[in-house]
């Protein structure tokens, strides 16, 4: 493929993506609606603080300026919230699950309490970058992963 054809194809692709993305964004109107953020932890903790900070501003930037509420659903390391988001929330775009990312591995590892298909969740983003650490005592004899 010549350089000119490749450039033309890329340009056409960009134009189509912009057109279709813009059209889809214009279709959504949340006027009179309420968006619910289901938090997998108790009020007052870090996940709750992130959700409330997002809720305070989120509706201002969506068409129709919907109300945004936070619904804390603690328990089982946020598995209760994940199960609820997947099984009981209507798939209408008005519910956002805010639970610990590792909870989706429960289903992949065969946890019978994980009542969802983790591959069917749509990832929106994360309010913060979190670093995890694994530590053991020297007495275990484990030196690395």
Name each model-derived stretch.
Residues 125-145:
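Hydrophobic/proline-rich hinge and linker segments of small-molecule sensing/allosteric domains
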Residues 25-120, 125, 138-140:
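N-terminal (or domain-start) structured segment
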Residues 1-11:
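Bacterial N-terminal signal peptides that target proteins for export
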Residues 10-19:
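Bacterial N-terminal signal peptides
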């Amino acid at each position: 493929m010549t350089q000119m054809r490749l450039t033309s194809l890329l340009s056409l692709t960009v134009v189509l993506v912009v057109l279709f993305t813009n059209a889809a964004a214009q279709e959504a109107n949340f006027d009179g609606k309420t968006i619910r953020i289901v938090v997998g932890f108790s009020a007052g903790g870090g996940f709750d603080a992130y959700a409330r900070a997002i809720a305070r501003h989120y509706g201002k930037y969506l068409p129709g300026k919907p109300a945004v509420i936070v619904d804390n659903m603690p328990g089982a390391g946020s598995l209760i919230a994940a199960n609820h988001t997947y099984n009981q929330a209507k798939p209408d775009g008005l519910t956002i699950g805010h639970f610990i990312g590792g909870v989706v591995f429960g289903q992949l590892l065969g946890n019978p309490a994980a009542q969802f298909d983790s591959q069917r969740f749509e990832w929106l983003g994360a309010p913060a970058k979190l670093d995890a650490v694994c530590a053991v005592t020297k007495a275990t004899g484990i030196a690395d992963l």
